[in-house]
Amino acid sequence: MERVKANKGAPGIDGVTIEDFPAHARVHWPAQRAQIEHGRYRPQPVRRVEIPKPDGGKRLLGIPTVTDRLVQQAIAQVLTPIFDPMFSDSSFGFRPGRNAHQAIRQVQAYVKDGWRIAVDIDLAKFFDTVNHDLLMNLLGRAIADHRLLALIGRYLRAGVLVGGHLEPSDIGTPQGGPLSPLLANILLNQLDCELQRRGHRFAR
């Protein structure tokens, strides 16, 4: 809960804020916890928010309810020790103890080693186009708890509320939830491994 509080953020579709959540949880959390433990919990759809990008485009965020943020954060804290050791040393984004400054220093080290050609790559609309089947297959290789896998799958398919209309989410993982960055790294680790296999130097 402390991490969810620290990240603050806007309310989800239920309108419950971080400040309102303790009172809300006293009423609703016991039943929600029992639903999670018995594999019956259904995440609520995320609320669509559009953020302007410097290039004039828009970044689409999906804001979960505070309850779903709390559950996602708990899942991320359980899965990070499992998956993070598998990640490449050249991966810096959304990882504990790693940051963009370290990525820059690694690139500077490549330059000192004589590498002179650099390619800057942007994975356009990555979060919006995540393949659910591929991601769930990767998760299933390391997670034996079928209830947890099913819950993650429900988060991926929870849908997006746009102007009062529920849109299905058959693809993608919404930017805005605590779990999405870890899921992105799990999927992108396949790219990192292939780049390493080919002998490329990179920082992601």
Residue ranges and their predicted role:
Residues 1-9, 46-50, 77-82, 112:
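Short, compositionally biased low-complexity segments
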Residues 1-38:
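Surface-exposed loop/turn segments and immediately adjacent short secondary-structure elements
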Residues 1-4, 74, 151-156:
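Short alpha-helical scaffolding segments that buttress acidic/His motifs in well-ordered protein cores
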Residues 21-24, 67, 71, 131, ...:
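Short amphipathic alpha-helical segments
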Residues 60-65:
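Conserved phosphate-binding loops in nucleotide/dinucleotide-binding enzymes
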Residues 66-67, 71-74, 100, 108:
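Duplex nucleic acid-engaging cores and interfaces of nucleic-acid transaction enzymes
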Residues 72-90:
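Electropositive, glycine- and tryptophan-enriched low-complexity nucleic-acid-binding patches
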